[in-house]
Amino acid sequence: MTPEDEELVARIRPFIQRRKGYSEQKMFGGLCFMMNGNTCVGPWKGSLIVRLDKARHEETQSEAFVLPMDITGKVMKGWARVEPEGITSDDDLKAWIDRAVRYVRSLPAK
């Protein structure tokens, strides 16, 4: 993980670790935070990746500081990459985490 990703992990963890169903797993070359066995959020190249409803993909992509999530050369619908400028405050970071947790909790547990 890059130093930026390690710093983001340290910022994410307090907002998610006390929630029921929380776990961590190495993924995407870094660390992802899981809820009930489903990938939820994590750092990636200094940005925050969040799992959201695929049906709202286009709407999410139009938000400020949001880029398509593309690890393999193909856009991953249902995921958003939030640039560092979009999570400068803890309130902004928590809001993205809360959105991802709400969505992921709607999925069947793994």
Give the location of each predicted region.
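Charge-dense, helix-prone N-terminal extensions
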Residues: 1-110
